[in-house]
Amino acid sequence: MKFSKVASFAFLALSSQAALIQHDVIIENIKRDAVLAGSAENNIASSAFTKRESEVDSSEDVQLEKRISFAGIVSSIINQLPSIIQIIGNIIKAGLVKRDDIDDAFALVLAEYPHIVSVFEDAFGDFTEAKRDEAASVGTQILGSFPSILTQVVNGFSKVLDFANSDTFSTGLSILSNFTSIASSFASSLSSVVQNGKRDGVEDIVSMVVRQIPDLIVEASTPFVTNAEKMKRDADVAASLVDNLVKKGLSTAIDTFGAATVASVVSKRQVSSFLSKVLSKA
């Protein structure tokens, strides 16, 4: 498998690894794999999660997020950003990733979305929706609806790709380069939907919002995708792409879903196992 597959998942994998290694309560049972980054002459390697040295009984397989600090996980991920940027930067400078590899990575990520969503659905399957008359029900219901939210987000961007009069890679790059503006427009529309729902006395606002996510994404993204110039396919764009993914991806996810939810995703055993399999097969 091409090196681009490793690069596609490098950020989330490294972040997950750093968070788990730093905050797992049974820290002595984890081998701390090293992630090395060097010049063109050095070997550049990334490692996935290793198996625990001692088997953990299935009855003790409690949710990891209950044994860790959400704030600590987010902090550890942020602390790893300089190293992650250095690793990816060295890979690009060393010529190990070419423009075609970036394109392949885009196609791969799009193709893997259904699988990723199914993994997240399994990871969050144990969450249940709270009663609507409870004070904190909306927040809990949003967390319980996260698999549906993820699916609708994927559907929304799929519609954008179908609608755009451009190739998949250029469309993806246009979305990334304008992601801040798109996210702002989406958030504004989402706020309007919520306010209108409250005004109209809608009982289940969360479900109503989830149903409208694809259309809201299309509405927010289409102006940027259809009017943007076709982005150049060169090394500068590749570097800019990685920079946008690292800097905007994490901050947008935390701003949109909250630090606790993002921490929950990267801390779930199923997600970690999936990433480990992807990297080990590369």
Swiss-Prot record:
Keywords: Cleavage on pair of basic residues, Host cell membrane, Host membrane, Membrane, Secreted, Signal, Toxin, Transmembrane, Transmembrane helix. GO terms for molecular function: toxin activity. Induction: Expression is not markedly induced by human epithelial cells. The keyword Signal applies. One of its GO terms (biological process) is symbiont-mediated cytolysis of host cell. It is found in: Secreted. One of its GO terms (cellular component) is extracellular region. It comes from the Eukaryota. The chain crosses the membrane at residues 68-92. Residues 1-18 form the signal peptide. Its main location: secreted. The N-terminal alpha-helix of peptide ECE1-III allows insertion of the toxin into host epithelial cells membranes. Secreted protein cleaved by KEX2 in 8 similar peptides (ECE1-I to ECE1-VIII). Stimulates biofilm formation. This is Extent of cell elongation protein 1. It comes from Candida tropicalis (strain ATCC MYA-3404 / T1).
